[in-house]
């Protein structure tokens, strides 16, 4: 009917300006007729954000939100994970994993503000990020439709994606000669794809964009002290810093000394293994320091149980269950353990290594008088006899039974 104007539905796209999200804008318009609203969440990408506004509009977005969430990222996502001591499969400090729920939260908020009916992301059908984005959206607004182009379109490789972009005049920061997929934020820089897909290939020094290769780091060690209050880092070398500035300063210190390179073949949630090389300089320092302070301030039972919690916490974060009831419950436990994790840790940084070089706390339960090998002290060696007799009683009873019945 003449004179009828149909307003296009809106979709909010998690936009990075990289290859995947760059071609998704025209694809959403061509495929669904959506008005595309791009959202870039600033979690410390740095200069990568500068060209995004112009690029998003040229790619066909009606508008773009660039949201500065660095402070929230550190205080509400990094610090809880650090306090938990969560490390996935013994190596991965979860830099991408805990950024995704924050981005999902921002998508949901902008969708509500714009009256959008859908959100979209550029995660592939082979990766973990699709799960992390979509679980976050489901937890925060289950009414929103989620569009995942990589699970729908006919593009099957990065080379095809680059051809699609070239045909539409969309510049992307990837070449067929160096097709690495990278994700950068305040916490880390990840590298995947290309020659890294063969785990026999060692990463070349030219791969690293943040960290100085250890062999090229200074020949003299650097010492740094970090102050913690209830498990949260608050100062570097005695200087009080806000959360973002603190991470940035430690990134610079660690990177200059070659600290924070992790090369891992990890088990993805979706069932396959993948190889990633991560640059996590400041994070490596903070995890080392935080753990050292816990050695001094946590009792044996709490520390051992917390190690199990840390493994589960890491799995929850890695799997995209940031907003789950279990994670909330684990946060309550972790916070209770951090009441006495206050003190100062000194670390030695040298050619890729990060070594504890001193720790002190007003809440230390290390008692020098008890453990001293010197004369005196508060410990009576005779007390050990009764303890050993009782502690070893089950073993003694079992051995007597085996002797009596002929089992041994």
Swiss-Prot record:
It is found in: Cytoplasm. Signal peptide: none annotated. Keywords: Amino-acid biosynthesis, Arginine biosynthesis, ATP-binding, Cytoplasm, Ligase, Nucleotide-binding. Disulfide bonds: none annotated. L-citrulline binds at residues 92, 97, 128, 132, 181, 190, 266, 278. Pathway: Amino-acid biosynthesis; L-arginine biosynthesis; L-arginine from L-ornithine and carbamoyl phosphate: step 2/3. CDD domains: ASS. One of its GO terms (cellular component) is cytoplasm. L-aspartate binds at residues 124, 128-129. It catalyses: L-citrulline + L-aspartate + ATP = 2-(N(omega)-L-arginino)succinate + AMP + diphosphate + H(+). One of its GO terms (biological process) is urea cycle. NCBIfam families: argG, PRK00509.1. PANTHER family: ARGININOSUCCINATE SYNTHASE. Belongs to the argininosuccinate synthase family. Type 1 subfamily. Homotetramer. This is Argininosuccinate synthase. It comes from Moorella thermoacetica (strain ATCC 39073 / JCM 9320).
């Amino acid at each position: 009917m003449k004179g009828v104007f149909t307003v296009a539905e809106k979709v909010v796209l998690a936009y990075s300006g990289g290859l995947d999200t760059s071609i998704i804008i025209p694809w959403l318009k061509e495929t669904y007729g959506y008005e595309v609203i791009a959202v870039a969440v600033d979690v410390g990408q740095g200069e990568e954000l500068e060209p995004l506004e112009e690029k998003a509009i040229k790619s066909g977005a009606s508008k773009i939100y660039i949201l500065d969430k660095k402070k929230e990222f550190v205080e509400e996502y990094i610090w809880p994970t650090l306090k938990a001591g969560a490390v996935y499969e013994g190596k991965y400090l979860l830099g991408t994993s805990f950024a995704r729920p924050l981005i999902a939260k921002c998508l949901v908020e902008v969708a509500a503000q714009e009256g959008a009916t859908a959100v979209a992301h550029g995660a592939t059908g082979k990766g973990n990020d699709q799960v992390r984005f979509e679980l976050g959206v489901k937890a925060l607004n289950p009414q929103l439709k989620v569009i995942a182009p990589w699970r729908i379109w006919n593009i099957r490789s990065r080379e095809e994606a680059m051809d699609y972009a070239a045909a539409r005049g969309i510049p992307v920061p990837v070449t067929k000669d160096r097709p690495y997929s990278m994700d950068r934020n305040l916490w880390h820089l990840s590298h995947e794809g290309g020659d890294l897909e063969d785990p026999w290939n060692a990463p070349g020094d030219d791969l690293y964009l943040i960290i100085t290769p250890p062999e090229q780091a200074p020949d003299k060690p650097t010492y740094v002290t970090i102050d913690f209050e209830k498990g949260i880092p608050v100062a570097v070398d005695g200087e009080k810093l806000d959360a973002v500035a603190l991470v940035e300063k430690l990134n610079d210190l660690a990177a200059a000394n070659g600290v924070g390179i992790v090369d891992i073949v990890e088990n993805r949630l979706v069932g396959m293994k993948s190889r990633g090389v991560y640059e996590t300089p400041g994070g490596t320092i903070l995890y080392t320091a935080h753990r050292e302070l816990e050695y001094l301030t946590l009792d044996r039972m709490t520390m051992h149980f917390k190690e199990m919690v840390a493994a589960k916490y890491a799995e929850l974060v890695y799997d995209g269950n940031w907003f789950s009831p279990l994670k909330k419950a684990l946060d309550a436990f972790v916070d209770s353990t951090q009441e006495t994790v206050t003190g100062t840790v000194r670390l030695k940084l040298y050619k890729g290594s990060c070594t504890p070089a001193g720790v002190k706390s007003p809440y230390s339960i290390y008692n020098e008088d008890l453990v001293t090998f010197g004369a005196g002290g508060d410990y009576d060696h005779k007390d050990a006899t009764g303890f050993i007799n009782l502690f070893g009683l089950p073993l003694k009873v079992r051995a007597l039974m085996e002797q009596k019945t002929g089992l041994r």
